[in-house]
Structures are given as structure tokens and as C-alpha cells.
Amino acid sequence: MMDKHKYRVEIQQMMFVSGEINDPPVETTSLIEDIVRGQVIEILLQSNKTAHLRGSRSILPEDVIFLIRHDKAKVNRLRTYLSWKDLRKNAKDQDASAGVASGTGNPGAGGEDDLKKAGGGEKDEKDGGNMMKVKKSQIKLPWELQFMFNEHPLENNDDNDDMDEDEREANIVTLKRLKMADDRTRNMTKEEYVHWSDCRQASFTFRKNKRFKDWSGISQLTEGKPHDDVIDILGFLTFEIVCSLTETALKIKQREQVLQTQKDKSQQSSQDNTNFEFASSTLHRKKRLFDGPENVINPLKPRHIEEAWRVLQTIDMRHRALTNFKGGRLSSKPIIM
């Protein structure tokens, strides 16, 4: 029987970037992969429903972003990711067109070409200057405030636009992650940092489109062919889901260790403290990247991931409605992380 878990290595790398040790157990990665697959299926089902409400059979990027519209920081990070992706694509297209334009020419008509070059040199320089100006596109969403009015303000082509509150919030989250990454990589050797850089490139979709489509069952869940950017958005969201689960599970494990330490202190307060001092000293020992497995440093276990999943699925009080007159059990669908 073929194993249904196909992303163990990628999940290990994502967990390592998020703060976990290099080799989590198979049960933990399998549970995370099942959770991520369930989230992807839920995203596809809800996006397909939104596309049908628009009267379309294919899923567009706006249908997926609409599901996470309340998380303004994540939406802004996703928009930045898509804009930089579009910028790289446009830069490659312009480089290719510039190469074709410079390589074409008729060698038999040398005099005429020389006259054209001499007369149009200034024009070519202007065209070349325009070629080099590649601006990062802005992803606009149809439910934003500006689309509620018939007339729109003129666009400002300057790059020094003021950031709104959502962009500042997204930048704060990004800076926190960069600070955490800087603290972890500060004392790394060259080989360790190369491994860290490789792990940061882990993805469910990059150069794995066929495997991802078979794994998620896109052809069975959607009628039409999804937009190309939808696969990239799903790759971005899967990375975010794994990082959120890992970071939350690490906080739960740390809180569990603190409670266990306090319990040991209270139990051994009247006894010899030799064993406790040895345990506490080994618990705070610095862990290197390529150290062998030890019994003292425990990896994330499935119970930590399950508790992290429960915490992340808790409905925020701001988005919870009163259910005083419904009675019975309160049914709710999974929350898109």
C-alpha cells in the first residue's frame, strides 16, 4: 500500500525554520501533513463555492484571498509575495524580449542599418531606459473600499507611498520572524547556515505542481482549471500553516516544561536536590544543529500538535455570534489558518 504522506522532508524543513529540532518523529510530521491537507481541501471547497457565486467555474486568486480577508497581516504578506513574483516574471520577459531585439538584424543591409542606428540611437536609449524600469505591481482586491465608489482617485506612480495600518502590521510580523531567524543563525557555522538556507526554500508547490495536485485532489474538487496563481497562493498558505502549528506547539511544549519543572520543585523540596539540579542543568544546555539525539531534549509530539490545532481553531470572540435561541450542539466549519 502506497504511503499517503508525501511531504515529510518538506515539513521537517519548515518545522526546523520555525524553531523545531532537525528530526521530528514521523508521527508528528504525518499529523501535520494530514492537517495541512485538510486545510487545503477546505480552502478549495470554499473557494469553489465563492467562484460559483460569481458565476465562474474556475477559481481565481481573489476567491482564495477572500477566505483569509480578516487576517490583514497575512493578506498583505501574500500580496507582497504575489507582487514580487509578478515583478520577477516581468523582468524575465523583458530580458528575453531585449535579447531578441538585440540579436535580430539583416546583415545584407549594412548601410541602411547603420543609418537607422545613427538616426535612432537616442530612441533606442530611451527604449532601453524604459525597459529597465520594472515596477512592482500592486494586487488590488475587489472588496476593498476604493471599489465601492464609481470614481477612483488618480494613481500615484511614485514608489514612496505611505504605508497603511495593515501594511505596518504585516511588516511587524515579518520583522519578528526575521529577528527570530537572526537569533537562531547568529552562532551557526557555514555548513549549518547553508542547511538553514536550504530549509527556508522548502515548499509544497515549487516545482512540485503535479505531486501537489495529486496529493490535494484539485481535479476532483474543482470543475475548471484553477488559475496559475492559485497554486502559488496555496503553496504560500501551506507554509504559513506549518509555521503556525509549529510555533504554537513549541509554546505549548515550553509551558508544559515550565509546569513540570514547578511540579518537580514542589515534590523534591524536602528531598535531596541533586537529581533536580542535574536535570535542570541539562535542560538548559545549548543544542547544536548537528548534535545527536538526546533523551533530555524532547521533540514535538503529536499531542503538542493536536493542542496547537485546538488553540488555532478557537473562534475569536469578535467573530462569534450569540446562539441563545438555536439550542443543541453548535456546528462550525474548520477555520482557515
From Swiss-Prot:
Impact reported for residue 76 to K: In strain: CLIB 556 and CLIB 630
Compartments where located: Nucleus; Cytoplasm
Intrachain S-S bonds: none
Outcome when changing residue 93 to N: In strain: CLIB 556 and CLIB 630
Gene: SPT3
Principal location: nucleus
One BP annotation, GO: pseudohyphal growth
Organism for this UniProt entry: Saccharomyces cerevisiae (strain ATCC 204508 / S288c)
InterPro entries: Histone-fold, TFIID_TAF13
Note: Present with 1710 molecules/cell in log phase SD medium.
PANTHER family in UniProt: TRANSCRIPTION INITIATION FACTOR TFIID/SUPT3-RELATED, TRANSCRIPTION INITIATION PROTEIN SPT3 HOMOLOG
Region called Disordered, residue ranges: 92-131
Any one GO MF annotation of this record: transcription coregulator activity
Protein name stated in the entry: SAGA complex subunit SPT3
Record field: compositional bias (Basic and acidic residues): 113-128
Entry's family note: Belongs to the SPT3 family.
UniProt keyword annotations, A-Z: Activator, Cytoplasm, Nucleus, Phosphoprotein, Transcription, Transcription regulation
List of residues that carry Phosphoserine: 270
Gene3D superfamilies cross-referenced by the UniProt entry: Histone, subunit A (1.10.20.10)
